[in-house]
Amino acid sequence: MKEEKQKVGQMRKREIREAAKKCFLNKGFQNTTMEDVITEIGMSRGGVYHHYASTTEMLKDLMLDGNEYRNSLITEYLAHNRSKDKYQQMGDILTSKALAKNDLMKLYALFLQAKNYNRDLEDLYQELKLHTTKELDLIAKKLGITAHIFKDGFLVHYINSLIVSSEVLNARNSFDVHKKYIKETMIQYIIDLEKNN
């Protein structure tokens, strides 16, 4: 009985997040209120507030959903590309992350812009950055890359700038056409880090 209740609760939270995602993408994060999400989902106010106290909490869970989704793609990629050179694999993983085209990346670009005006979002960004870089560092280590590839922040800033440019400046087509240069930049950076390690 308790497990069934938890499953239903998780389903409700997912439904609320999907409604919130729709609102965020249509209105922007800063302009979306709890009332907007409640209206979008058609659930009672108490039902929504039972699961989420704020749109920031919803955004956090959406970002965690995005990380989970990205991790599943990485696991699948690694299972099918074992024969590739370690640098090529890491380059593919990072380039794929930077140039992904989906609603969660659009949402992440909104999040990156909004965090400059919201302390809670900045804190969330730092938490997500730490979590993501630790996971990607572990993957790099498993591939045999000895350097700490996120130590100076360059790759994080480079990837985030590509994401924001893709969404805000409509640079995605250009980046897709020139993807090999983006990948080569990341690979060369990692190789140079290893040489200087």
Where in the sequence are the language-model features?
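N-terminal intrinsically disordered/low-complexity leader segments
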Residues: 1-11, 196-197
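Helix-turn-helix
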Residues: 2, 15, 19-57, 61
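Residues in soluble alpha-helical coiled-coils and helical-bundle/repeat scaffolds
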Residues: 53-57, 61, 82, 99, ...
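Hydrophobic alpha-helical connector segments
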Residues: 61, 75-102, 142, 155-156, ...
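Short, basic, alpha-helical segments at the C-terminal edge of helix-turn-helix-like DNA-binding modules
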Residues: 64-70
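Amphipathic alpha-helical segments used for helix-helix packing
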Residues: 86, 98-123, 168-172
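Short alpha-helical scaffolding segments that buttress acidic/His motifs in well-ordered protein cores
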Residues: 94, 108-112, 159-163
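Hydrophobic/aromatic-rich alpha-helical bundle segments in the mid-to-C-terminal region
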Residues: 122-126, 130, 141-197
